[in-house]
Regions:
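Outer-membrane beta-barrel channel domains
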Residues: 22-258
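Bacterial Sec-dependent N-terminal signal peptides
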Residues: 1-24
Length: 258
């Protein structure tokens, strides 16, 4: 996910985010582990067990870009109009007296090799992100991704049998070599005071530390949720409601409410 995150980092790192600091750090498990370890070393008050992290909570104690080794591209192309729009500026910025709307592309292309199955693996992702704020109390974020991928055999077996890719949603065959799938997530945050905020969205949440969680993991597909965060001094209380769905084509009508 190097390319995808590099573009995210450039977008979220612009001065615009300072006007409304309710955006999440992009939620990739491997990166969360590095950020979690770096935050723990600072011994600063930080609630690491509830993810995704807020940028407003991370940036006072660590620099996420430095921890993850993100280095902005500084070549000649980066100084051109196209390069600036890809690496350091927002592609589209609509500003108005009480806020702004920012639109940016997101790309990812990775390749690998499954030696046991003698198979070349790859993922091709194209997407768009939209974020903005209305005054100091309202922030919003949304993204959409279209993907094609050649998967390792154990994931191909799941996709062929159930019609889904774990954590990625429904899939359909892509030519004869892979699978096609798409997903979206987003959220709206209302922060009436410094010590409380209300967030409604569709996405993933994680409760716990480390790679896996028995309480709430990020393995499930995106789901609608309502979250209320209340914080006073070193105490933080989170209320979380969500609705999980079994999205297998044959069981799409069966919901599990929590």
């Amino acid at each position: 996910m190097k390319i995808l995150f590099s573009i995210f980092a450039g977008v979220l790192g612009t001065a615009a985010f300072l006007q409304a600091q309710h955006y999440h750090q992009p939620f990739f498990t491997e990166q969360q582990l590095h950020l979690e370890a770096a935050a723990a070393k600072t011994r600063a008050p930080f609630f690491s067990a509830i993810k995704p992290y807020r940028l407003s909570a991370l940036r006072p104690i660590i620099n996420p870009d430095s921890v993850l080794g993100v280095k902005p591209y500084r070549g000649k192309f980066a100084r051109s109009w196209t390069g600036r729009k890809l690496f350091s500026e927002d592609l589209i910025r609509i500003a108005f007296p009480q806020g702004q709307i920012l639109v940016n592309p997101a790309f990812d292309f990775t390749m690998g090799r499954d030696f046991a199955g003698n198979k070349t693996l790859w993922t091709n992702t194209r997407g768009v992100t939209v974020r903005g704020n209305l005054g100091k109390m309202f922030s919003f974020y949304s993204d959409f991704y279209e993907n094609q991928a050649a998967l390792p055999q154990y994931l191909s077996d799941v996709a062929d049998t159930m019609g889904i890719i774990p954590g990625q949603g429904r899939s359909k065959p892509f030519k004869s070599v892979g699978y096609d799938y798409a997903w979206a997530n987003g959220y709206v945050v209302f922060a009436p005071a410094q010590w409380v905020d209300i967030e409604f969205g569709i996405g993933k949440n994680f409760i716990g530390d480390g790679y896996r969680s028995l309480l709430l993991s990020d393995v499930a597909f995106n789901y609608p949720y309502l979250k209320i965060n209340t914080q006073f001094w070193r105490f933080k209380y989170t209320n979380l409601w969500g609705e999980f769905q079994d999205i297998r084509p044959s069981l799409a009508g069966d919901n599990l409410n929590t």
